[in-house]
Amino acid sequence: MQMRNMIWPWRRKSRRRMARIVVDGPITGATRKRVLKALREVKQREFPALLLRIDSPGGTVGDSQEIHAALLRLREQGCRVVASFGNISASGGVYIGVAAEKIVANPGTITGSIGVI
């Protein structure tokens, strides 16, 4: 697993932690496997929050759906999820992001085009 796809706990002066997962590039079967593995670790380690950084033009529908569903299940178990859109979040990137309770993006972020082929 490459460094950019790992979970990163942050600690300040307390025991509170947050996980970070990066979805970078096209969403493929390999992306799905990597992200689902990271989400399982977030669940097992009981992180109270997840920052999901998305910089993706999209990808396959099935892989995006599986990540979306896994994020919703994680939220049901009490983990707070925030999506942060990078330079681009389109198609499957947006689909994954809407599973978060909040989305943040820069004014110049290219966003949208769900379902356009």
Residue ranges and their predicted role:
Residues 1-117:
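Terminal-region recognition feature
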